Amino acid sequence: MQEATIAIQIVYMPMLFLSGATIPAAMLPGWAQTLAQFMPASYLVTGFQGIFFRNQNLWDNAAAVGALLVTMVLGTFLAMQLFRWEKEEKIRPRKKLWVLAVLAPFAITGCYQAYSKENIGKNEGLFRDLQRSETYLIRNVRIFTGDGRVMESGGVLVQNGKIAEIYDGATPDPLKLKAEVVEGQGKTLLPGLIDAHVHLGGPAGISSAPEDYDAQKTMPRAAAALLYSGVTAARSVGDGLDASLKLRNAIDAGSRLGARISVCGPMFTAENGHGTEFVEHLPAAIKETVKAQLVRTPKTPEEARRQVRELKTAGVDCVKAILEAGWGDGMLFDRLDLLLVRSVAEEARTQHLPLAIHTGDARDVADAVEIGASSVEHGSWRDEIPDRLFERMAQQGVYLDPTLTVAEAYAQYFAGKADALSSSLVQQVVPARILQGTRAFVDSGKGLEPAKAELFQKAFTQARADLLRAWKAGVPLVMGTDSGNPLVFHGPSMHHELQLWVQAGIPVAVALQAATVNNAKLLGIAARTGAIRKGLDADLLLVDGNPFEDISATERISLVVFKGERIHRAGLFDKK
């Protein structure tokens, strides 16, 4: 019995710590979390936490229930095989082999979990719930609520991941609120920014490392870079379907930390239309597989409708179509037939999916508005959008997303410039090898194309002018960056877009509203985020200074809050 007691203690104590029964398993090193997957106690602890903290049922925790039953049955069986009435009684070697047989199910389960990391992800989500349950008061801070209102001094109480109260002026005693204090003197509190136009799979720069072009790795890092930069939500408008859905679901479950993602999935375009060039030069062995993830090229209205329904079934949040013929040398594309675009739009409305339409000139914009787009992406980069078309957009409530940053970035890229690389925020979020590779490529002159630089500079100038006219005409505005394209880095580009809007003549409050409340409405998440309003998720950005005096203050980030969790920004890139 003494030997048995010692053996039990040797096994029991590691199980107690590794299972998460004493400290959250998510706080353990990665190797320890993986080792814990071979212990049935890990699933029991995770299961009970899911039931108590997330109000889950037994079916939601089938793995934990199974682990408990298997442990009971096999443990009883093993005890019977190894039972001895007397200490001196010998156990036959054959019976000792039952120990290995009993451990086999746990070895198999552990190997699967070590590979899939499903239970590890659930542990991280539960730990995140714990972090988001804190109560704290941000006080003595300037508050922009998102809808244009500014409180020069006030406070926000965050509780259980939500905005519990908003105080205009003096705040209550934090001791009575049982709240920790976050001092906001000299700072401004904004709703978390939202980027309405991103390509998470694009690295935005040049690298010699293949992993920097692997969407399974670049997309999670892009979501982390967005959150690091105070962008708490984004709309993916042209990324691999499976990878983007997987990332969105992991972030929603709390098993991965990053900006919440709205997924449009593959882009609807013509057979040789814009978007297909990204897969044109891929090896034949993978070309069709990648193409199926990135684009849809319907040939008939029936096929277009079916493809929209399939995307809805897959779980997308929106749909994107491209209505663009291109311009200039080497940038001409087939334009998607209007009958097919109309079919996409009609089915998207039936499926309650917002439709974003990429446009290139005023004709494209007119067709997009007539067809019923929810948002016009880019607007016209080649000619002026007529006043009557802006009037119609205002009447129909069609959003304009001008994406000034990407037009400026291409103009610089083809001119042999890379001003974005000097941004402090860019240097913080972009891997060093991409910064170095991009700088080396630009300095080499290999990307220098003066004719294209001139075209994009004209496009940028036209887009700026149309933005100002659209605002004056009452067109609802949203803000996106087209990040993932060259020199348009995920996260920092949103702050640059704000600066470009203000430089174009847009009032700061209007620009900030486009980047928060309006974007939330477009993405269909306004009931959860996008504003500083009681009851919404606490997605917040605290910055040093006053953006209404200097819009670049949004880059001076003091604190990022996501669903109530105060983000440890430096740790966002630790997870591989």
What are these regions (language model features)?
Residues 294-295, 299-336, 380-504:
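Active-site neighborhoods of metal-dependent hydrolases
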Residues 124-130, 143-155, 168-171, 461, ...:
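Acidic, glycine-enriched loop/beta-strand segments at the rims
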Residues 148-190:
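Histidine-rich, glycine-flanked metal-binding segment
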Residues 16-74, 82-89:
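Membrane-interfacial helix-loop-helix junctions in multi-pass membrane proteins
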